[in-house]
């Protein structure tokens, strides 16, 4: 099961391995668990002032290697893991903003972390 918990946002999916991603909006970080064991902690950016990142337990419903935002001027969203409507975990080139709120609501991660997460979720 793969699970995403934002702030506590939790993300799970039925799978070979139990994958759980726990996003802390307070700490602007994501803990990655596999079969209950913490395997990584990565910096993230959630919604900046005036925007909202949803809180709750979610399951991924769509994975897209390259998605372009329909809402924000075709902004590229590499390695998108959609969990609630248009909200996704995806790569950002603005890695200097990671660790603080900076998004329109999605959970932004570094390009290398997004590739790791995408494969982890895709394979499980």
Locate the predicted segments by residue.
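General beta-strand recognition
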Residues: 29-31, 59, 88
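N-terminal signal peptide c-region/cleavage motif recognized by signal peptidases
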Residues: 12-14
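Exported/periplasmic cell-wall-interacting domains
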Residues: 18, 48-57, 64-124
